[in-house]
Each structure stands twice: as structure tokens, then as C-alpha cells.
Design a protein with these regions (language model features):
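Bacterial N-terminal signal peptides
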Residues: 12-23
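A domain-start/cap signature at the N-terminus of enzymes
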Residues: 21-71, 129, 154, 158-161, ...
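Serine-hydrolase catalytic machinery in alpha/beta-hydrolase-like enzymes
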Residues: 49-57, 68-146
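Loop/turn elements at helix/coil->beta-strand transitions in domains of secreted/extracellular proteins
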Residues: 68-72, 98-103, 147-150, 171-176, ...
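Cell-envelope and extracellular/periplasmic
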Residues: 75-80, 141-144, 156, 163, ...
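Primarily recognizes the serine-hydrolase "nucleophile elbow" in alpha/beta-hydrolase
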Residues: 142-143, 149-196
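The feature captures the conserved acid-bearing segment of alpha/beta-hydrolase catalytic domains
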Residues: 176, 181-254
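Extracellular/lumenal mature domains of secreted and surface-exposed proteins
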Residues: 254-345
Length: 345
């Protein structure tokens, strides 16, 4: 039986299945699978994450195959009434079908160009959105086959605020952040948060004829990220105006997923009394090098020691918190970064 026999298009299923009318607002929830367990594809509307109750919308490619691992795009809508979560999802349908992406569009409270972001504390809507987004991703990953090395958070216009904030606070989830003609302020993250996320990929672009203020905010992002050591940060003006440009974001994202090495640090221990011996191994998955060969590996062990070996055993003699920073350069010259911390008591 072909894939189309196994997986039912969302629109056809809604005609054949019983839909749920939500008491609050009467919105129609699309079942994400049929009664006999088949995955529904296409537009999946008004899902509600179990623990937070947050609404989100999905697009599942019509040729979805659970034997594959799919890149996941988490996208934040622009300022209401110019955009909303379902409409933001709809903007991604063509890219999702063309490139094989699963798209998740939560209903963000903080996706507004008018959001006030204090210097001394996170804005409450950002914190609420962060909690909901993490829970939604957990739910989505439990239902679908997701590439853990291929999760992007992106925002258009006012959606830049939650995209940057949530991405920076969760580098353990997201491979990259993309701001699409999006808002930014340096108040979104502390220097400590930036330090823990500086290995990430970040891309911001704005229109050459963009709305007032967006070029300046993206140049502010350029300064902020660059000064905090984000080595894989890119800024690029694009022709046109305030264009959400999903295709540009998708191409950037998929270039990373399909051609850059994904790396992890395997540490024998991350905490203990001094002197603390630790064995560190660089784990590399490179789509362009199935045999695992890379050009070079470089460790900064956090105490003014370096190593170029894929596996290194090092003893930390003094108490302290050590930031271990790893760079892997692949055979095509791409430099990927990862980091961890060793706490010596």
C-alpha cells in the first residue's frame, strides 16, 4: 500500500469524520489521526496542548512517512490584526509541501510589535509563550517523526519577539532562530542566557524597503548577537518590503539540516569534586559525510587548555564552573559549535 493509502489528507478526513466543536468559540478541531490510528495530513487546526491548553495549528506534508524524520518549523505570527496563528501556518503550506517540512504555529500572546519588553525582567507574555511552546513541541514530537537536529523557531514581524526569546532560552531544543523582517530588542535575553546559546545558528533578514524601524532593529540584533560571540549569525537585506518570505527561511534552515554537521558532546561526568577527570567525546552526524570524516575538531576545555582530538580526557584540578566549547569543521568548511559545562566542587 502506498503512503497515500496509509495517510489521509486533512480536508478529506474532516468531511468523513466527526469534528469536535469547542465550547469556547465554536472552533473546529481537526483530529490528528483517524479512529484506526492513521496519521492525518494537510492542515490540522485548533490543537490544544494538554498541560497548558494552548491552541496551535499544524501542517503535515501530504506524503508524510513515519519512517522518515522531518524538520520542524515552529513559527510565530505577526501583530494582530495583520496576522494570526492559523494564517501564519497557511503561509508555510507551499514551503512545507515543497521541502517536506512539518509546520507548527502556536497562538502566541507575545507576537506583537507593540509588546513592552522591560530591561530588568522578562515580559509575562513571553514567559507564558515559552512554557506553552516547549510543551507543544513535546506533544508534536510524541505524535510525529521529527528530526531532533532539525528544529527551527522563526517569527515574522511582531513574532520576532517570541522567536528570539524562546530560541535563546532553549538552545537544547532549537538548531536555529530566524527573524523574518522581525522585531528585536536587546532586552529579550541576559548575557548569561546568550552565553549558553552562542553555539546556535541565527539568521535575520529585512526588506530593503521595509516598514520604518525594522532595518534598525535587525541591525541592533546584528550588534547584539555578534558582540556575544554567536559565530553562526547572519544578517541579510532582501529585495522588497515587509515580506514574511517563508521560502528564504526554509532554504536557510534546510541548508543547515542537510549540509552542516550536527554535533553533540558526550561527557563522562559533568559534576564532581576536585580533582575531577572528565572524558569528552565529539559525536558528529554529517549528512554529507556518512563515514563521519571531518576536517578538524577543536576543544576549548574552559581552563585555558585546548585539544584537537575527537576524544580527550582532562583533569580539572580546581573548583569552578568550566565552559567547554567545541568546534567541528566539516570537509566543506562548515563550522558547527556545541558547548557544555563542567562543575567542579
Amino acid at each position: 500500500m502506498g503512503n497515500r493509502g496509509k495517510y489521509v489528507a486533512g480536508g478529506a478526513l474532516v468531511l468523513a469524520a466527526t469534528v469536535l466543536l469547542l465550547a469556547a468559540g465554536g472552533c473546529v478541531t481537526t483530529p490528528w489521526r483517524t479512529a484506526d490510528g492513521r496519521i492525518v495530513t494537510g492542515k490540522i487546526d485548533f490543537q490544544h496542548e494538554e498541560t497548558t491548553g494552548r491552541t496551535y495549528h499544524l501542517y503535515i506534508p501530504t506524503n508524510y512517512n513515519p519512517k522518515r524524520r522531518y524538520p520542524l518549523v515552529v513559527t510565530a505570527q505577526g501583530t494582530f490584526p495583520f496576522d494570526e496563528a492559523a494564517g501564519q501556518r497557511n503561509r508555510w503550506v507551499d514551503a512545507a509541501e515543497r521541502y517536506g517540512l512539518i509546520v507548527c504555529s502556536p497562538d502566541f500572546d507575545s507576537a506583537s510589535g507593540f509588546l513592552s519588553v522591560p530591561k530588568d525582567r522578562p515580559a509575562p507574555p513571553l514567559v507564558h509563550d515559552e512554557k506553552a511552546t516547549v510543551a507543544i513541541i513535546k506533544e508534536v514530537r510524541s505524535r510525529y517523526s521529527i528530526n531532533p537536529d532539525g528544529i527551527m523557531i522563526t517569527g515574522w514581524s511582531g513574532g520576532g519577539f517570541p522567536a528570539h526569546f524562546i530560541g535563546l532560552h532553549h538552545p537544547e531544543i532549537f538548531r536555529c532562530i530566524v527573524g523574518r523582517t522581525a522585531n528585536f530588542t536587546e532586552n529579550l535575553a541576559s548575557d548569561d542566557v546568550a552565553l549558553r546559546a552562542r553555539h546556535m545558528h541565527v539568521y535575520v533578514f529585512f526588506g530593503e524597503s521595509d516598514l520604518p524601524g525594522f532595518a534598525a532593529q535587525n541591525r541592533e540584533a546584528n550588534f547584539w548577537y555578534t558582540m556575544r560571540g554567536f559565530r553562526n549569525f547572519v544578517i541579510q537585506p532582501q529585495p522588497g518590503g515587509h515580506d514574511p518570505n517563508q521560502i528564504e527561511a526554509a532554504r536557510y534552515f534546510l541548508n543547515i539540516v542537510n549540509h552542516w554537521p550536527a554535533i553533540q558532546i558526550d561527557a563522562s561526568t559533568t559534576e564532581g569534586p576536585a580533582p575531577l577527570p572528565v572524558t569528552l567525546r565529539a559525536l558528529v552526524r554529517d549528512p554529507d559525510s556518512p563515514d563521519g570524516r571531518v576536517d578538524s575538531v577543536l576543544w576549548n576545555l574552559g581552563d585555558n587548555r585546548i585539544s584537537s582530538s575527537p576524544e580527550v580526557t582532562h583533569t580539572y584540578e580546581q573548583p569552578g564552573l568550566y565552559n567547554v566549547f567545541l568546534m567541528v569543521k566539516d570537509l566543506d568548511g562548515h563550522q558547527e559549535f556545541k558547548q557544555t559545562w563542567i562543575k567542579v566542587n
